Amino acid sequence: MIKKTRTLLLSFLLITISFITLTGCDQTASSKEKDATDKIIRIGFQKFGTLNILKAEGTLEKVLEPKGYKVKWTEFPGGPQLLEALNVGSLDLGHTGEAPPIFAQAAGAPIVYFANEPTNPKGEAILVPKDSPIQSVKDLKGKKIALNKGSNVHYLLVQALEEYGIQYEEIEPVFLAPADARAAFEQGSVDAWVIWDPFFAEAEAKTGARILVDGTGLVQNREFFLASKSFAEKHSELLDIVYKEIEKAERKTIENKAEVAAFLSPQLGIEAETLEKVLERRTFGIEKITKKTIEEQQKIADKFYELQLIPKKIDTSEALLKVDS
């Protein structure tokens, strides 16, 4: 009986030790897996923009490698989709136009601005088919207009309609991502298309689309760089590195626009001549967010709330990481 008891006790001890060992291994493996995940910077980008140039050159990876970081790039059809991924924790940072952060903040997304590009009003426009009878924004009354909901061009449409005395309710917005909007535009399913570069320039080149009006005098059309609040608070030094690498990429682009266009062409599937046109009418010069810029964002937010495009009033300064005077 004593021998049997000792045997059972020994078996119990062996099982307990094995369990503790395996649990320790699992915890170590989980810890290593978490460390590996923490060392990956997840960046969202769109079809064209400064981050797209940075990705193509691969310089950010080279700078971060000695620090033990890797970069994971994910492409999105537009800013709203990118910020949704940022909201649910699938990304650490990315870039959008001026309107998407407004919609994201109104939805409670934990995002912060950390930098922006200069204004670029010529980089977006309301287009109509080359043989369309529509000659003015006034003619858009009662028409179907394709646009990516919540994107920078959403604000362009709002401003253009107001400028020409048309109520937002007097047009029929058709919310489509760029690729689907292009198809609808070519098939005649919509009367006009509000779109940004490079889709804008490509539509001009490939379909002969006519510019009804661009953003000049109507919108600022800035490109913003945003991060999840938690990432920004924990990794300000990484945001500084990204900022500096964007600066370098922009200097190279300004000095060699034709070369950069040729380099990006096969990667984007867009002709170099079209990309060069985009680069020529675009402004460069990343800068820290200022109070003035945030105040301009507030005006957009107030307008969207007035039109009931967002469910509540927001304070854009609450999404500010840092303000330079």
Predicted regions and their residues:
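Short, polar/charged alpha-helical segment
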Residues: 40, 47-75, 80-81, 85, ...
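Flexible hinge/capping segments at coil-to-helix
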Residues: 33-36, 129-144, 233-237
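Pocket-flanking alpha-helical
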Residues: 52-54, 77-113, 122-130, 134-135, ...
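Pocket-lining segment of extracytoplasmic ligand-binding domains
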Residues: 99-100, 170-265
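Secondary-structure end/capping motifs
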Residues: 233-309
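Short, low-complexity disordered leader/linker segments with a strong preference
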Residues: 1-40, 325
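Ligand-binding cleft/hinge of the Venus flytrap
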Residues: 54-69, 154-173, 204-207, 262
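Short, well-ordered beta-strand elements
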Residues: 34-49, 69-75, 142-146, 172-174
